[in-house]
Amino acid sequence: MAKKVIGYIKLQIPAGKANPSPPVGPALGQRGLNIMEFCKAFNAATQSMEPGLPIPVVITAFADKSFTFVMKTPPATILIKKAAKIDKGSPRPHTDKVGKITRAQAEEIAKTKAPDLTAADLDAAVRTIAGSARSMGIEVEGV
């Protein structure tokens, strides 16, 4: 018989930097999960990723105090800002443009995000990324 699920916890944790301090500790502690076990497993799983890159993670907590977790791809906005070499988007995105990315950069981001996007093909995924970039005040060349 399958284990009884008692809850799901959604967090964004920097790659390789999970520790028992908030938000990780309180979120897992409320469900009675072993915080250090999660931190070690998460840090080991994100070892090959760029340190500090925020990684969304969904933790499934079971009644026997065990857990599993699924890591998602980094948020598109983070990847877009990194490609455009800017710190934040425009406060008035359709009026003030703060940066540019090329179609090749948008394709690279779309390939990275592909597992989490609902797009049918690469071109649709690129258009999704381009839309996110435009809403941040970043111009996308060639889309």
UniProtKB/Swiss-Prot annotation:
PTM per Swiss-Prot/TrEMBL: One or more lysine residues are methylated.
CDD domains in the cross-refs: Ribosomal_L11 (cd00349)
Family annotation (PROSITE patterns): RIBOSOMAL_L11
Any one GO BP annotation for this protein: translation
UniProt-listed InterPro entries: Ribosomal_uL11, Ribosomal_uL11_bac-typ, Ribosomal_uL11_C, Ribosomal_uL11_C_sf, Ribosomal_uL11_CS, Ribosomal_uL11_N, Ribosomal_uL11_N_sf
Pfam families referenced in this protein's UniProt entry, alphabetically: Ribosomal_L11, Ribosomal_L11_N
Single Gene Ontology MF annotation: large ribosomal subunit rRNA binding
Domain of life: Bacteria
Keywords noted in UniProt: Methylation, Ribonucleoprotein, Ribosomal protein, RNA-binding, rRNA-binding
Keyword Ribosomal protein attributed: yes
Keyword DNA-binding (UniProt): no
Alphabetized HAMAP family for the sequence: Ribosomal_uL11
Subunit-structure text: Part of the ribosomal stalk of the 50S ribosomal subunit. Interacts with L10 and the large rRNA to form the base of the stalk. L10 forms an elongated spine to which L12 dimers bind in a sequential fashion forming a multimeric L10(L12)X complex.
Function according to Swiss-Prot or TrEMBL: Forms part of the ribosomal stalk which helps the ribosome interact with GTP-bound translation factors.
Family according to the record: Belongs to the universal ribosomal protein uL11 family.
PANTHER family assigned: 60S RIBOSOMAL PROTEIN L12, LARGE RIBOSOMAL SUBUNIT PROTEIN UL11M
Protein name, per record: Large ribosomal subunit protein uL11
Organism listed in the record: Methylobacillus flagellatus (strain ATCC 51484 / DSM 6875 / VKM B-1610 / KT)
Lineage: Bacteria, Pseudomonadati, Pseudomonadota, Betaproteobacteria, Nitrosomonadales
Gene that encodes it: rplK
